[in-house]
Amino acid sequence: MLILNFNNMKKVYIAFLSFAFALTSCEFDAGFEDMNVNPNAANNVAVANKFAKTVLDTSGGRYENWRNSLIYNSVLIQHYSTTASYWAGDKYFRYDSYATSLWDRNYPTAVKGIEDIINQLNQEGNSGSEMGIARILRVFIYHRLTDTHGDVPYSEAGKGYIDGILKPKYDAQQDIYMDMLKELEEAVAQIGSSSSMGNADAIFGGNTTKWKAFGNSMMLRLAMRMTKADAASAQAWAVKAISAGTMTSNDHLAAVTHTDGPEGINKNGHGEVFDVDSQMRLSATFESHLSGDPRLSVLFAPGSSNSVIVGMPNGSTSDSYVSATTGLTVPGVTDRHVYAQTHPALRGKDVPMVFQT
């Protein structure tokens, strides 16, 4: 009987404490949310600040510019040539970590950033110049991704936080191209006579006239890349772009301003590569295309063992080998310094990264 009374007393005591705590908890909680907020952190980041970061993410760092832009694409299209075996673009080798570098870097940074910017502009009711500029940059980001990989996440990409889409679908490249053209047309129309981006815009400094020319020129570029797939649509969009007004001088050149430090994307990604990898040389194919062109001596300088600009044949190796096609012995390159290099003025880490001319 005493045990039962003791248990009953425990229950009453616990109930009393719970009731007392409930009465006082409101007083204890008052202002708790304010105490748990970092007074030095911003509640909302301005679109201009996000845009500055996204532009630098799009320009990219050493990682993706070395692997995607140079090791693969530059020798694949035969602007550069090298005897280095890991420069796989013109040697039919495959390195997945190199081939996917643009994807690996852009989706978590540039794609996520630009989708967040557009979402914030929508929430703020901004349908003017800032939205038009953001949409043009968005097209440029996806333009490079689909040209590199074909079908890619597009319509649902970068919306993991915004819409909870954790597994975005892959869109067909044809659908992506048609939507990008539509986006450019609408984006240019949204841009007015001024923008609040200002110095946060490391491409044009908020100059809306130049952004319009960039948007129309990118429309023309996309149209030209469609000629083998859909000639009629390509012609229609090309005419539309030219009529709207494309780039007409070097003053319209779309390029990102970089600095020689601190580390990371503040530096030109290509410049960082040139600082540590001296393997690449002018391609003989590109040299032939620029024969008699004054731009050749602006882009390249003679190799240290030569006084004239000479290009290296693509597919060259440092050792001789027998061609499986002709049965002839192909001599190896014994002195790569005979061949031209990128002009020193273009190799710095503070050189602008050109998006389009």
Model-derived regions, located:
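Membrane-proximal, proline-rich intrinsically disordered regions
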Residues: 26-81, 85, 94, 105-108, ...
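Bacterial Sec-dependent N-terminal signal peptides
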Residues: 1-36
